[in-house]
């Protein structure tokens, strides 16, 4: 936790002098110069434990910790024709340690994936015609760690209705991934050196429509179609058959997913908002899931608010899942990854937001400090905790 705090403080110091020098713009003037609209500094700490590790065939520790730090900078500029140009630049780095990944090599003191760093930058450009209510966007991203490299791209289109109370959005994303095939030590070919590689591709299309029903109620409908192909197993996951033999996880090379959701926000006066969300999910691996989420931000004073939240999730098992020692040679595909088992889970927590009129630490443009904590509990013996800190410059 000390590392999380120091990282956030160091990033804050980078912008301190600038925040003190820039005057507030209280006019309606739209600057044609590129300027900083918003900066978010986020640090989080995540910890989990369980006893159904897929690395050891569905048994064994799932202990894991992750420290993540991201910086998100949004820049805006208005062109001569009044077009708004937005550039969103984000960079993040995680460091994790995993007791289960340390068991890839059962005889070694430490396996290749027992701890790692992940670096994930992204860049998004939006071109908004405010007069027509139309926005187009394009973005690129990447994610790099020891055994995984991912490159992503997306395009989007949004159009508001004539009365500006509704908005339609279409978005397409693709991710091109490459995995190192780090096999369990006992399944590697004798004398083999290095690791092989395999590809995984994801294509996702999203359609959404949001509508202001009245002064108090807003709703959004969203649907996705997601197609994956390539190597969809994880190479270091073991599967133990009923005869005691050990195998490498084997899954189909295609997967098709359809999530459908609805989101609503209801404003109870000036101080309370009720935010609700429901999602139904299905795929061609016979996994079906339901998610229900509720968050109620309550403004206690002009500068302080609380946001209790709760999420319930339930899913059926994928048709290729069986616990430790239950698969047989008759199974074409097999996994003992409990993320694909039948379970239900709950996630409960609280957010605290502080927006003092004079800014955080007396820095006017650093106007928001938000702390969120959540506890996650799953019916198949997995539990986790996460705490995050977000400091916003605007």
Name the predicted role of every residue range:
Residues 109-111, 223-226, 232-263, 282-297, ...:
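Outer membrane beta-barrel transmembrane domains
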Residues 21-37, 78-86, 130-133, 162-167, ...:
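Short loop/turn motifs that connect adjacent beta-strands in outer-membrane beta-barrel proteins
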Residues 1-26:
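Bacterial Sec-dependent N-terminal signal peptides
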Residues 71-75, 121-127, 155-159, 207-211, ...:
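Residues on the lipid-exposed face of transmembrane beta-strands in outer-membrane beta-barrel proteins
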Residues 66-70, 116-122, 150-154, 200-204, ...:
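Transmembrane beta-barrel architecture of outer-membrane proteins
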Residues 41-47, 89-93, 123, 138-142, ...:
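Transmembrane beta-barrel strands of outer-membrane/channel proteins
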Residues 20-77, 88:
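Short glycine/proline- and aromatic-enriched beta-strand/turn motifs that initiate or cap beta-hairpins
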Residues 52-56, 60-65, 92-121, 167-218, ...:
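Outer-membrane beta-barrel translocator/channel fold
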